[in-house]
Structure formats: C-alpha cells, structure tokens
Amino acid sequence: YFSDTLQLISDLPGEFLKKPVGKLGSIYCSKWHYNDRAAIFGDAAHTIVPFFGQGMNASLQDCTVMYSFVKKYDGNWDKIFTKFSEKQVPNGHAIADMALENYIEMRDSVNDPKYKIKRELEFDLENKFWDRFVPRYSMVSFHELPYSEVYRRGEVQSKLMYSFIGGDLTKKKLYEQIESNLTPIR
C-alpha cells in the first residue's frame, strides 16, 4: 500500500474509469515464412499474453535459431525458412499456451486447496529428483530447453502429481514413473 499515491491522483475513480481497457491475446501461426522470400519472428510470429515473462526471450531465441540455420544452409533461403518454421512454430505455440495457463493459474488456482497440495508435492519432488523433476518456470528461466519440451515435461509432471494426489499412484509408483518418464536435464 502506497498511501502517498492518493495525493498525486486528484480524481482516482474518474481517472481509472476514463482509461481504455486494453485487450490481451495470443497469435498462433501455422508457419512463419513464405517460400524463400520472407520470415517472421518475435512478436510478429508469436504474440503472447505477458504472464510468463518470455516475450523478449522467445524473440531472441528465434534470432539464435534463425542464425544457426543461416550458417548451416548457406544461402538456401527456402530450406533456412522451412527448417526455422518447423523448429520454432511448436515452441511459439508452447510458450503461448504456458503463458495463458500461467494466467489462469494465478487467477483461479492459488486459493484452491488442491492446488496448494500440488505445489507442496511439486517442491518435495523437485528436492528429491532435482535433476529430473523441474517446475516449468525453472525449466524456462534456468535451462536452455525448447519451449515445446518444457511444455511436454510440464504436462507429464502435472499428470503424475494429480494421479498421486487422486490416489491412482502410490509413492513408489510415482517415483518409478518419474525415473522412467523424465530424463535428467541438469
């Protein structure tokens, strides 16, 4: 709470109500190039809601991947752009999905007792399987994994946790599933 702020805004309700409401959304493109003529990347290819904080990182990742294909395919723009789209479109879709899911989680789940149980279990599993069971946010922020791989691993981890919480898996089976379904990343 910043009590001195009210003194700086003479008509807070009026100012608030006359400001336009912005819209947020994600754009999903099926490919990010047109033949050997042009490619899009960054926000032009994957406009996403800002709830994972990865817009700039995703754009820089696009530049890095494009550069690797420019070096590899030496002027063959059709191949460069095709390979770029094949690799990056799934990553763009994955980070867009994760950002939206993160918003929904922040909006709806934080007060849900089941969610709190899941978060506690997630911390416990991360401590026990520190090289395999890594939360999505940590995978995105501290590892160089493609977003599509982060998304896939996050889905596996979530499914395992909910199966355990729901009583479908014993602790022993949960541990076995983690060992067999999640390769080390650290």
Segments the model singles out, each with a brief description of its role:
Residues Q7, S68-R186:
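C-terminal helical "tail/cap" subdomain of flavin- and related membrane-associated enzymes
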Residues Y1-D78:
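FAD/FMN-dependent oxidoreductases across multiple families
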